[in-house]
A protein has these predicted regions:
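Non-catalytic extracellular/periplasmic "stalk"
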Residues: 1-52
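Catalytic cores of peptidoglycan-degrading enzymes
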Residues: 41-176
Length: 176
């Protein structure tokens, strides 16, 4: 990956901090909806290329642990909402995460999708389970096209694979 995404210069580090603060603010939303209680589906099918909790190493430099899972898929593959919810963040150009979308599933449960090549939703949109929210990409600090799926319960990271059936047992995704 480009060196300035591994060890960003001070001006870029300030931008990254500002962007991360915006994402953190979006995650503070906590309401009584229970979209999460209807279960989660895989947003994309493909080879799992990055595991939750693994040590990330870029250009030989150890970085933070991986707070989501990566699914390799061709650029332009549709990304589907894994559960219903409200879009609480959508930005096509964050420095490290590229095209980024966060969906609030209620009671502090949220999903995030990173490195998207296109975003088809905006903040405030209500999305249904299975709805296309954008397309797989390789934007931000990415080694190739994939969909990063992270889950949070407020500030606590959660492994998305705990919430879905094993990938090998998933039926084909149908666009809604």
């Amino acid at each position: 990956v480009p060196e300035n995404t591994v060890n960003p210069p001070p001006a870029i580090a300030t931008r990254i901090e500002r962007e991360q603060a915006g994402v953190g603010t979006a995650r503070e939303r906590d309401d009584d909806r229970d979209d999460f209680s209807h279960g989660f589906d895989w947003p994309v099918h493909g080879r799992i290329s990055g595991q939750y909790g693994s040590q990330r190493i870029y250009n030989g430099t150890p970085k933070s642990w991986h707070s989501g899972m990566d699914v390799a898929a061709p650029k332009g593959t549709p990304v589907h909402a894994p559960a219903g919810g409200i879009v609480i963040f959508a930005n096509p150009d964050l420095y490290l995460t590229g095209g980024t979308v966060l969906i609030d599933h209620g009671q502090g449960v949220s999903s995030n999708f990173l490195h998207m090549s296109r975003i088809d939703v905006k903040v405030g949109d209500r999305v249904e389970q299975g709805q296309v929210i954008g397309l797989v990409g390789a934007t931000g600090r990415a080694t190739g096209p994939h969909m990063h799926w992270g889950m949070n319960w407020l500030t606590v990271r959660v492994d998305p694979q705990l919430l879905v059936t094993p990938a090998s047992e998933q039926p084909a995704i149908e666009a809604k």
